[in-house]
């Protein structure tokens, strides 16, 4: 994944959409690799909410994610990966009509999140139950000086995303 957007002047909406798509591409490319590294005990994965792009979809997804973490944590990573895979599809097809609670419910069900939990998505999102969590995650991210997502740290050092552009590059970097 390369940060091509850094050298191009884009209007804020286009820039935010491109940054979100790059994050979705990264997460989709590395989902299986990250799962394997976790299963093998080679990494610790910490997913933190971060709303740096100002998109309404982020509010929907973060509130749903907070609920999944609280009520069905065993499926949180699968849900996370499925949300980014769906977002990438939406961005590639330029179909913002799919940025809905109903889409998140379908994604959650596909990812194995219990129906009892996905049935709570609408109320959780409408009440903005996890907004304080998202705000705290975003403030922490910014206070640490991070600028974009995804942010990858290996042995405490932030990784340049150009180092992890292949599907096995995280594994190679960690095994160095």
Spans of model-derived segments:
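C-terminal cap of thioredoxin/glutaredoxin-like
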Residues: 22, 109-176
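Extracytoplasmic/secreted proteins, especially bacterial periplasmic and envelope-associated proteins
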Residues: 29, 33, 59-63, 67, ...
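Local sequence-structure signature of Cys/Sec-based thiol-disulfide redox active-site neighborhoods
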Residues: 1-28
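Polar/charged alpha-helical tracts
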Residues: 6-16, 36, 106, 119, ...
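Structural alpha/beta surface segment adjacent to cysteine/selenocysteine redox centers
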Residues: 3-4, 25-96
């Amino acid at each position: 994944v390369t940060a091509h957007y850094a050298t191009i002047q884009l209007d804020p909406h286009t820039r935010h959409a491109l940054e979100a798509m790059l994050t979705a591409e990264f997460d989709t490319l590395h989902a299986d690799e990250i799962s394997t590294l976790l299963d093998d005990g080679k990494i610790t994965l910490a997913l933190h909410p971060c709303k740096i792009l100002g998109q309404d979809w982020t509010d929907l997804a973060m509130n749903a994610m907070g609920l999944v973490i609280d009520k069905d944590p065993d499926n949180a990573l699968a849900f996370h990966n499925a949300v980014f895979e769906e977002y990438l599809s939406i961005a590639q097809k330029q179909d913002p009509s799919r940025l809905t609670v109903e889409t998140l419910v379908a994604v959650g069900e596909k990812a194995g999140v219990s129906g009892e939990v996905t049935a709570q998505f609408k109320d959780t999102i409408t009440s903005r139950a996890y907004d304080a969590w998202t705000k705290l995650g975003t403030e922490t991210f910014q206070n640490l000086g991070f600028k974009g997502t995804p942010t990858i740290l290996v042995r405490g050092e932030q990784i340049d995303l150009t180092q992890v552009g292949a599907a096995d590059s995280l594994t190679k970097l960690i095994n160095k």
